[in-house]
């Protein structure tokens, strides 16, 4: 059992890539552990740690790749009762540049 994982999401050749990271569910057994997300310049743009943030609502992050052309996710799960569910995708440009489909009703509630 290795409690620490690091995933590096790399650009696959898309110009102006943006990563969409969805942190869907997090459980830290015995109040120990963390999940951190870093942009391509190494700046930490998201963190969740400890008991008071277990099973909290989804976090949906839009992250520019920057010069290094990657995004990094670090997870520390200190025991076998801990878990994190994370999904991601890579887009060309940001979500605001996407075209809306005429039949879809879209509302933006909160953008961070």
From Swiss-Prot:
Coarse class of the protein's main subcellular location: secreted
Signal sequence range: none
Any one GO cellular component localisation term in the record: extracellular region
Transmembrane region(s): none
Superkingdom as given in the UniProt entry: Eukaryota
Keywords of the record: Secreted
Compartments, as annotated in UniProt: Secreted
Tissue expression remark: Component of the acid-insoluble and acid-soluble organic matrix of the aragonitic skeleton (at protein level).
Record's protein name: MAM and fibronectin type III domain-containing protein 2
């Amino acid at each position: 059992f290795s409690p620490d994982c690091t995933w590096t999401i790399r650009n696959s050749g898309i110009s102006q890539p943006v990563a969409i990271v969805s942190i869907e569910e997090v459980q830290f057994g015995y109040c120990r552990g963390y999940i951190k997300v870093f942009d391509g310049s190494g700046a930490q743009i998201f963190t969740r740690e400890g008991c008071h943030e277990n099973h909290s609502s989804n976090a949906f992050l839009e992250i520019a790749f920057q010069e290094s052309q990657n995004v990094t996710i670090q997870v520390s799960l200190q025991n076998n009762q801990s878990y994190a569910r994370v999904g991601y995708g890579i887009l060309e440009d940001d979500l605001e540049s996407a075209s809306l489909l005429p039949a879809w009703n879209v509302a933006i509630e909160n953008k961070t």
